Amino acid sequence: MMPKVISLRPLKDFYDLDVYPSKDITVMELGASSTLLKQEILQSDGIILPAVGSKLDSSLFEGSKIKLIQVTGAGFDRLNVAELSALGIPVANIPGGSASAVSEYVVSVALSLLRNLNYCTKSII
């Protein structure tokens, strides 16, 4: 039987980057609020989880055969990693994936504040 992975991130996000799953894996796209989520978790081997969204209760994973939860960002805010560890489920993230974007944002906001650009915009409007 092929491993089954649930993606709570739209598969289109991956396809747009020319990233496709192996033919040896079944990937099912679900929304975090799907009524099928608990049922599918019990039958799946892994989950791809976007970094942004509502928290997922650890009880969803009790009795599951999940071998890995992969977060597609740096943070673990959506999960209780300690509770998942107690269930034997490792959680992985992608630290530094958006570091350059964050640094660019910080520099642009700092320049905006130094140049009073937000006040200029208000006076134009």
Q: PLM features: what roles do these ranges have?
A:
Residues 2-90:
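An N-terminal-biased, well-structured beta-alpha scaffold segment characteristic
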Residues 87-89, 95-125:
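Phosphate-binding beta-alpha-beta segment of Rossmann-like dinucleotide-binding domains, i.e.
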